[in-house]
Amino acid sequence: MLQRDYFIRIIEEFTAALAQFLEKKEGQQRQRYLEDLYRQYVGDYSLLRNFTVEEAMLYARDQWKEEERIDRLEMLAELYLVEGKGLQNPLRDMLLNKAFSLFDYVDAHSHAFSLSRQAKMAEINKLLCR
């Protein structure tokens, strides 16, 4: 129980840090902050960003505890989404597709229904003109 409370606190910190990132202006400082978010909450930026969805899933299985895996995959999807929205194609679509795939996986395997997650998936579909 204590470990779950600790991880819930990590999720809350991640949400606050992501909101702070979204307030930053474009530029190198914003990019460094994004890379720090990856490093602090999910892992190495250059590694995770360049993974396919399948590779990210294998990484999750190997690196994260089972009870944290779904939440960390959702964090990774959030990072893909916010980064993808700030880029041009083809990187934009690549990251948005990865974000959608991870959100879809989390939605199917999570024990909690999330309207926020559903809204993000709808937003991605709209951005990708699906």
Spans of features found by a protein language model:
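N-terminal alpha-helical interaction modules that lie
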Residues: 1-73, 105, 126-130
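Short coil/turn connectors between adjacent alpha-helices in alpha-solenoid helical repeat scaffolds
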Residues: 22-33, 83-95
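Mid-chain, well-packed structural core segment of small domains
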Residues: 66-92
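Amphipathic alpha-helical binding modules
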Residues: 89-130
